[in-house]
């Protein structure tokens, strides 16, 4: 059994072990694989693991021995699943491994913005507190979350976990979701999109990326928001029109944004959000806590073992 990991570095930069995977067969782990290297490295593989390396129909057709593709992520749009299905190849993903970590990052951004953590750290490094005549140096008010309205777009596991944390802060939680009001706990109010954008103080994106949600947040939606509103995106970068968001931040249409994802990663140097006013960006790391990556590695092993036992789990091909 030949196993090849095409881009293992993101999930395991060296702090975790590949030994259990290597015990399942002849295993080669590459940190990164360029598109031109895929066919050579994947040749003869029965099991192929990828995080972001694209496996399109042409590539899949050129790997006749391939029986299983394991995506080391929840999203699997990098795989031509129709081509895999046609050739009888099992494709699995890693669901729900990072849910607590991503919800935690939502509030890392919210708290950084509302408590101005980065701002005050920067000012202290400049000596402004040292030179202050008062014991408490401040030059901008902080924002209390209790009583504020948060709108959550997409109430899957991460959206629901975000809602639970918000409830703990005493926030009023609104959700745009396909679930009926009867399926929601009483603390979460089902809200239509127009009302959510217009009335919520914070909006957090947790919906999947589809044709209907691409650039869901655009100039028209941003104009619906309050001037003191905050946008959080830990979901998918293309949910947001980036130029529209940069314009809205720079002209004061909304107050701030906290982003963990962008439409292109790594971003181009001319991405307008990199220099936008009150735009705080983390480099797609919400998923990457040590605990989350440990879960990812364990689910990866469980998926492969189930496949080898003839009882695949977490298959994305129905």
Task: Describe the predicted segments one by one.
Residues 1-45, 174:
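N-terminal glycine-/charge-rich "phosphate-binding" loop or analogous flexible N-terminal tail
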Residues 31, 72-73, 89-100, 177, ...:
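Short beta->alpha connector loops at strand-helix junctions that form conserved
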Residues 55-61, 174, 179-272:
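Rossmann-like adenosine-cofactor binding region
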Residues 87, 95-149:
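Phosphate-binding beta-alpha-beta segment of Rossmann-like dinucleotide-binding domains, i.e.
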Residues 91, 172, 228-318:
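Rossmann-like dinucleotide-binding domain for NAD(H)/NADP(H)
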Residues 158:
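Hydrophobic/small residue at the entry helix of a nucleotide-binding pocket
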């Amino acid at each position: 059994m030949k196993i090849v990991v095409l881009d293992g570095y993101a999930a395991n930069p060296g702090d975790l072990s590949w030994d259990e995977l290597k015990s399942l067969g002849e295993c080669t782990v590459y940190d990164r694989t360029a598109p031109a290297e895929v066919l050579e490295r994947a040749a003869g593989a029965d099991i192929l693991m990828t995080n972001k390396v694209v496996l399109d129909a042409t590539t899949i057709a050129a790997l006749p021995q391939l029986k299983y593709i394991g995506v080391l992520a929840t999203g699997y749009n990098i795989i031509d699943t129709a081509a895999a299905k046609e050739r009888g190849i099992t494709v699995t993903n890693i669901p729900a491994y990072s849910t607590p970590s991503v919800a935690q990052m939502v509030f890392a951004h919210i708290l950084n913005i509302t408590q101005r953590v980065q701002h005050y750290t920067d000012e202290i490094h400049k000596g402004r507190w040292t030179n202050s005549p008062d014991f408490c140096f401040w030059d901008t008010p902080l924002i209390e979350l209790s009583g504020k309205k948060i709108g959550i777009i997409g109430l899957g596991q991460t959206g629901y976990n975000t809602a639970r944390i918000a409830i703990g802060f005493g926030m009023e939680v609104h959700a745009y979701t396909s679930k009926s009001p009867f399926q929601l706990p009483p603390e979460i109010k089902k809200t239509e999109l127009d009302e959510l954008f217009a009335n919520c103080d914070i909006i957090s994106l947790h919906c999947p990326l589809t044709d209907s949600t691409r650039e869901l947040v655009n100039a028209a939606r941003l104009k619906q928001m309050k001037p003191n509103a905050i946008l959080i995106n830990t979901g998918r970068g293309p949910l947001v029109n980036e130029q529209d968001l940069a314009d809205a931040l720079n002209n004061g249409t909304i107050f701030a944004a906290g982003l963990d994802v962008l439409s292109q990663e790594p971003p181009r140097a001319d991405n307008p959000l990199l220099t936008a006013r009150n735009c705080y960006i983390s480099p797609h790391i919400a998923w990457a806590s040590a605990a989350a990556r440990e879960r990812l590695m364990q689910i990866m092993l469980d998926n492969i073992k189930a496949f080898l036992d003839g009882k695949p789990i977490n298959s994305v091909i129905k």
